[in-house]
A protein has these predicted regions:
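N-terminal Rossmann NAD(P)H-binding glycine-rich loop of SDR-like oxidoreductase domains
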Residues: 1-7
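Short beta-strand element of Class I
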Residues: 13-15
Length: 207
């Protein structure tokens, strides 16, 4: 929200939506307190909505005249938000693959399970869906592309490790949603030598 506010001269009016509108209002207060709103003439406001209620979410998108929906919710809501964007005819962005809460660690290729099945409908509706623009995938991909294009003559392998730096005084800190982290302990898929490999968690040790 802060980053979007910093670029609201391009993005225009911004609506934050969640089941609990109070959470959105706290974020808006933080944006205003830190003076993150680049163009104060643009609106920054909140609305309450259940993202799993596709008709209600579609109506909210239409009522707010939104042109882009940036989905920063749990991965369980990705497909309902995408369906609402298809119904409203607006651009969709998310930060991770969709997850079915009833299925733990589905087999890859994950995007083929849900997102790619809607590719033809996105094309028919003229809807752009930009997937996985969080950190991994997302920022990681951008750094890898930068390294390949500007810093190395050739790259054989790239190892991606999820780590935390520093200390905030807590015993355990997750890189992602804690539930997603624990689900991934059940089954671990890794891309090795151009193929998916399933191994037990912590099967490989780094020395």
């Amino acid at each position: 929200a802060h980053k979007a506010a910093q670029h609201n001269d391009v993005l225009g009016d911004i609506c934050l939506a969640s089941r609990r509108v109070e959470k959105c209002d706290q974020i808006i207060d933080s944006v205003r307190r830190k003076k993150s709103l680049k163009d104060p003439s643009k609106k920054l406001y909140s609305r309450a909505v259940d993202a799993l209620d596709i008709p209600a979410l579609t109506k909210l998108i239409q009522d707010t005249r939104s042109e882009i929906v940036i989905n920063l919710g749990t991965a369980y809501i990705n497909m309902s938000v995408l369906e609402a964007c298809l119904a409203a005819g607006v651009t969709y962005m998310d930060t991770a693959i969709h997850e079915d809460p009833a299925k733990v660690c589905e087999d890859p290729p994950w995007y083929a399970n849900y997102e790619w099945k809607r590719k033809d409908r996105c094309k028919e509706k003229g809807v752009t869906a930009i997937l996985g623009v969080g950190f991994d995938p997302g920022v990681v991909n951008a750094y890898c592309a930068l390294a390949v294009k500007n810093h190395f003559d050739g790259i054989d392998t790239i190892d991606i490790l999820d780590v935390n730096a520093g200390s905030h005084g807590k015993y355990f800190a997750t890189n992602f949603d804690p539930e997603i982290n624990f689900r991934e302990f059940k089954k671990v898929w890794t891309w090795i030598d151009r193929q998916w490999v399933c191994k037990p968690v912590h099967a490989d040790k780094w020395t």
